[in-house]
């Protein structure tokens, strides 16, 4: 038998299946989807079995094939569906197969490779060095570097006293805990008869034999009052043994979830629910765009359709942007479906995430709630896929391998013949245009549940505030509104849009701004560490006391970060309890949930935060939302800037007045006449959509045209320019005259990490030769560009244009 294996080497030259002989003793356990250890050149590496055949390819010499060394899994980590998906993504998006397979799996099961020196001749190794080798005769390269032993080891390598080895290790470790069990082979009644005179041992054995189906930990026995001597006595007699029991890492093990019953649907909700249910029952693929205003009850529609899926014996997947994966959202699912829910997001440890993933693979969890990468959850019988806040750009992975969760969800829904729901209060233009064309089925929820009115939205022109002498970041209206809520003991949410509005240092005399020496961007000031940092390459420095350019002492922080706003708020409202939510305050595990719980309990009056407070908050006492700087995103060099401003402001505004108490939203802006801000005030998505579509049509942008962005980078400007011209020429040769090939031109961020960046943007409607052109460029890059250390990034359907 032959296994066709994709090896764990991220190189274009080995991006195909290698044939390996399956040893006879492994034939019964090796199947597609399992991980195996195989010899590859001089190394031993991990691979994934893609298929099993009786015979190798005709042109191969069987005598030269190597054997699989070891199989890592009892059952496959990859389903046959995920294998097919990786093949499809590899061929349509020009992604290496191994890169696609690894993004599908939890990081805990990815192989780690450690470079080491292996002792060959112990006698010849100097005694001072000998003690640094472990019991297996290895001295790891990293340790040798730390200890300054590399030079000596390289000499020993040359003299054939040591050899270089690459050691394969696993990230994954099972969590275990000491437990106790009865030894099989004895009849309990016979043992108990022998223990009648030793009462405590009798009681302990009786308990253990009755609870054989359960895992009994040592700590459980101690808690029940059984003594150590009683246990030791039973072990000595050979009736009981200690062992290491595998413990599942459940991030919610200490939580009790009250069961939640389904809510009565409104007429609009019921219509949407019925349309989706029909496709669940008939097992047909259809994409629904659920367009509902904030607070219209989209989540309840999701929950009730999932109930129908589970009643049919099928499974459901719910995707939520990482930023909106709030404890409140998880709580609703856990209350409705209990242990049937697995949660997958970056806040979990590697072990917790792997155990949640295994629950899905083994069929113990039938519902997943997770961020972007959970779209690859190993369900075998999907009945529904939901993408909440479908407009979010974070559903596109910006790093290699680049993929969009929506596209993966569509592929999987076709594979399983099940519907997809794309839900949003502010759908992306591409999705709404598809719904208008009939490609998607549009479902509308135009009203909030319980006849609750949408909040009143007021726009404050900050230019007028400035002309009236108010240089503060709080307008007169916002100040008064905050004070009113504090007097009424109601809660306030204040949103600071940090995108394009970070704090930096500025010399008031000459205008000097400290720049990153490696990137074309100003350094951001962080008050907690009192450092200037670059968010692109990680460079940091101490803020100068005087200007390096003109030696003036008038150099200070400009722009307002959340910490500065918190200080100003505390000065304005001395008695207010302020909870700040940003990257700094939520970096520790569980901090996000802890802060929100405090606010929900009423232990905070004002919640101040960045984008992470824009979604998912549904608290009855929030009656005021203030947007401190509405238009900073409008100034970004991106054709989606207006759309993202509209979406973000609408989402933030939706946090106010969701229950009995009426809500108010105050938006502070220097662009009060901009259509994206005016349409938020009117809560008029369709007017915004029509206006923005006109601009997209004029500019030949999506949804009228598709885009591909090519970014070429290198440390030398001359090489970047030459390579960019070459890429441009290749594209013109392969594409028709209808395609627009723009550039090459410097990227908006023209230098990052000391590398110059040029971009070529292709706009097209239908290009039969496009895939061939991308394939040709990818091949050309691996043949020519890599040698020159040139980087080529091919971004299909780019979400970020910087």
Regions found by a protein language model. Give the residues of each.
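Inter-lobe coupling/hinge segments of SF2-like helicase ATPases
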Residues: 260-266, 270, 283-721, 760, ...
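Accessory, non-ATPase domains that flank or precede helicase/AAA+ motor cores in DNA-metabolism machines
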Residues: 1-368, 375-408, 414-424, 438-452, ...
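Short, flexible, solvent-exposed loop/turn segments with mixed acidic/basic and small polar residues
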Residues: 8, 129-131, 697-702, 747-752
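Short amphipathic alpha-helix segments
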Residues: 683-686, 721-742
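Short, intrinsically disordered low-complexity segments
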Residues: 35-37, 44, 743-768
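Short beta-strand elements
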Residues: 734-747, 786-797
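Generic solvent-exposed, charged/amphipathic alpha-helical segments
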Residues: 87-90, 479, 566, 570, ...
């Amino acid at each position: 038998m032959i296994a066709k294996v994709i090896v764990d080497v991220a190189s274009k030259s080995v991006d195909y299946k290698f044939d390996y002989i399956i040893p006879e003793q492994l034939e019964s356990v090796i199947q597609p989807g399992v991980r195996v250890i195989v010899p590859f050149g001089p190394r031993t590496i991990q691979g994934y079995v893609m298929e099993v055949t009786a015979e190798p390819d005709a042109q191969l010499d069987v005598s030269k094939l190597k054997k699989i060394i070891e199989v890592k899994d009892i059952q496959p980590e990859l389903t046959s569906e995920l294998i097919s998906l990786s093949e499809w993504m590899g061929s349509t998006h020009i992604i290496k197969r191994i890169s696609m397979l690894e993004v599908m799996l939890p990081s805990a099961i990815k192989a780690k490779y450690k470079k080491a020196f292996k002792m060959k001749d112990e006698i010849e190794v100097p005694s001072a060095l000998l003690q640094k080798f472990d019991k297996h005769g290895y001295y790891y390269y990293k340790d040798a570097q730390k200890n300054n032993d590399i030079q000596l080891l390289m000499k020993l390598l040359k003299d054939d006293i040591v050899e270089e080895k690459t050691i394969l290790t696993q990230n994954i470790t099972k969590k275990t805990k000491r437990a106790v069990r009865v030894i099989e082979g004895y009849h309990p009644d016979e043992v108990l008869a022998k223990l009648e005179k030793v009462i405590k041992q009798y009681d302990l054995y009786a308990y253990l034999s009755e609870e054989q189906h359960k895992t009994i930990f040592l700590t459980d026995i101690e808690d029940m009052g059984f003594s150590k001597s009683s246990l030791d006595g039973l072990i000595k007699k050979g009736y009981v043994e200690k062992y290491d029991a595998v413990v599942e890492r459940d991030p919610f093990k200490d939580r009790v979830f009250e069961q939640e019953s389904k809510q009565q649907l409104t007429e609009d909700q019921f219509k949407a629910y019925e349309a989706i249910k029909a496709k669940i029952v008939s097992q047909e693929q259809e994409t629904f765009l659920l367009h509902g205003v904030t607070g219209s009850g989209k989540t309840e529609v999701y929950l009730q359709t999932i109930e129908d899926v589970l009643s049919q014996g099928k499974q459901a997947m719910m995707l939520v942007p990482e930023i909106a994966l709030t404890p409140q959202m998880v709580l609703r699912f856990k209350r409705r479906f209990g242990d049937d829910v697995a949660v997958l997001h970056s806040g979990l440890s590697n072990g917790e995430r792997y155990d949640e993933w295994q629950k899905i693979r083994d069929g113990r969890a039938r519902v997943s709630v997770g961020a972007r990468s959970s779209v690859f959850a190993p369900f075998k019988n999907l009945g529904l896929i939901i993408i909440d806040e479908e407009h979010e750009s974070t559903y596109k992975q910006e790093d290699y391998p680049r993929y969009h969760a929506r596209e993966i969800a569509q592929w999987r829904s076709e594979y399983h013949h099940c519907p997809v729901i794309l839900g949003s209060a502010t759908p992306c233009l591409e999705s709404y245009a598809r719904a208008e064309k009939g490609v998607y089925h549009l479902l509308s929820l135009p009203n909030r549940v319980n006849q609750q009115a949408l909040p009143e939205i007021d726009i404050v022109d900050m230019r007028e505030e400035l002309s009236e002498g108010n240089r503060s970041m709080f307008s007169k209206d916002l100040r008064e509104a905050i004070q009113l809520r504090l007097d009424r003991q109601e809660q306030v949410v204040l949103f600071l849009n940090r995108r394009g509005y970070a704090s930096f240092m500025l010399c008031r005399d000459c205008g000097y701004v400290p720049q990153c020496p490696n990137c074309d961007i100003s350094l951001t000031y962080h008050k907690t560490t009192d450092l200037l940092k670059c968010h692109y390459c990680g460079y940091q420095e101490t803020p100068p006391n005087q200007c390096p350019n003109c030696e003036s002492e008038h150099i200070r922080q400009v722009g307002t970060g959340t910490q500065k706003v918190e200080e100003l708020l505390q000065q304005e409202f001395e008695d207010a309890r302020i909870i700040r939510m940003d990257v700094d305050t939520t970096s520790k595990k569980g901090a996000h949930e802890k802060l929100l719980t405090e606010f929900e309990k009423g232990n905070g009056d004002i919640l101040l935060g960045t984008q992470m407070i824009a979604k998912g908050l549904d608290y009855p006492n929030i009656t005021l939302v203030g947007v401190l700087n509405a238009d900073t995103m409008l100034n970004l060099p991106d054709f989606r800037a207006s759309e993202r401003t509209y979406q973000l402001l609408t989402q933030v505004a939706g946090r106010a007045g969701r229950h009995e108490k009426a809500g108010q939203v105050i938006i502070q802006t220097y662009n009060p006449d901009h259509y994206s801000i005016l349409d938020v005030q009117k809560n008029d998505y369709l007017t915004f959509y029509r206006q923005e579509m006109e601009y997209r049509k004029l500019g030949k942008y999506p949804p009228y045209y598709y885009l591909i962005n090519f970014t070429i980078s290198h440390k030398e400007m001359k090489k970047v320019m030459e390579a960019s011209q070459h890429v441009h020429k290749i594209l013109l040769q392969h594409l028709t005259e209808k395609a627009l090939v723009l550039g090459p031109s410097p990227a908006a961020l023209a230098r990052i990490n000391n590398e110059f960046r040029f971009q070529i943007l292709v706009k097209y409607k239908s290009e039969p030769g496009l895939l061939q052109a991308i394939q040709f460029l990818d091949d050309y890059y691996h043949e020519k560009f890599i040698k020159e250390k040139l980087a080529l990034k091919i971004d299909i359907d780019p979400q970020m244009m910087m």
